[in-house]
A protein has these predicted regions:
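Alpha-helical/coil-rich non-catalytic "connector" segments in signaling and regulatory proteins
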Residues: 1-172, 185-221, 225-227, 231-260, ...
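Flexible glycine-/small-residue-rich
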Residues: 177-179
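Cyclic nucleotide signaling catalytic output domains
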Residues: 259-264, 272-287
Length: 303
């Protein structure tokens, strides 16, 4: 399964601020939210169609009063939208205090856009920016997968990695997640793996985005692999802990076994690390050990 990591809202904001004078008025903590697309939504009924990670644009034609606008904002946040752009002027002249207070509390970004801005141009410009970013991320993901599954054919992936300033000796942080097939109950056997993997990958992507870390997350067979360009240290530990916590949240739905790579992982040995961490995940399942470190690999081979 391929779920391409999207653009970070903060990057969109930097572009829209200079090109369209878009201003942030609340919810700055959410600027690291990922954005898949830009949608114009004017009615509450359409919120239920959102998939999450959308930047919503509205003129407020249907939410003119404070109570309706606050309800609209809450529904967007609960639907997983990344932020809201209000085209102020004709229908909404200012963002109500109650909306600002709520957005600050939950970290949901609210922006204002001058009425003079043509929304068609605004939406198209930002969607093009998102598409370009996703193409770049997609090429990086493809190259890293080739470094794992076709590692001898360096000419197919090293030029792309060089474009991203990644070389054979670049240190890589790698985490492998294993989701065994089947289960003991009928519910486990009937489990929808596709939706589960989709949601788990998106949550992992958001963890890296919040940490300002360049990363790739992909699924192959019963494994989800996380690869990030991050130097050894406390930040690796924090990310590993968050992924472990995430797996605990999902473990009620499906059992997850995690193997965390050591500090010697580089692009040149990525394929070996993938093999070793996959084995360690399966060993963890046998020992009912949900989280394993690569340093345990030697012990696992004694069993």
């Amino acid at each position: 399964m391929r779920v391409t990591m999207a653009i970070i809202l903060e990057e969109i904001y930097e572009v829209a601020l200079h090109r369209y004078n878009m201003k942030l008025v609340a919810g700055g903590r959410g600027l690291r939210n990922l954005v898949d697309w830009v949608h114009t939504v004017e009615e509450m009924d359409y919120v239920s169609f959102l998939k999450g990670r959308e930047l919503i644009v509205t003129t407020g034609i249907k939410e003119k009063d404070e109570e309706m606008l606050e309800c609209f904002v809450k529904s967007l946040y609960e639907a997983g939208a990344s932020g809201l752009v209000i085209n102020v002027g004709k229908y909404i002249t200012r963002v109500p205090h109650s909306v600002i207070t709520y957005s600050e509390e939950v970290g949901f970004p609210i922006f204002v856009l001058p009425w003079e801005v043509h929304l068609v141009d605004f939406n198209r410009d930002l969607c093009n920016l998102i598409y370009k970013t996703m193409q770049e991320q997609d090429s990086l993901e493809t190259a890293l997968q080739k470094a794992i599954f076709s590692h001898k054919e360096e000419q197919q992936y090293m030029p792309v990695l060089h474009e991203h300033h990644i070389h054979k000796d670049t240190e890589i942080f790698m985490v492998q997640c294993y989701f065994p097939a089947g289960g003991n109950t009928q519910a486990e056997r009937n489990f929808d793996n596709t939706q589960f993997f989709y949601r788990f990958i998106r949550q992992c992507q958001q963890i890296f985005a919040h940490k300002k870390v360049q990363a790739v997350v992909f699924q192959k067979d019963l494994y989800i692999t996380l690869i990030a360009r991050i130097s050894p240290g406390k930040e690796r530990t924090k990310i590993a802990e968050e992924i472990a916590q995430l797996s605990q949240q999902f473990s009620g739905q499906k059992k997850v076994y995690i193997a965390i790579g050591d500090e010697e992982t580089i692009v040149a040995n990525l394929w070996e690390k993938y093999r070793d961490l996959s084995y360690l995940c399966r060993w963890g399942r046998k020992k009912d050990k949900q989280i394993c470190q690569e340093e345990e690999l030697g012990i696992s081979k004694l069993w």
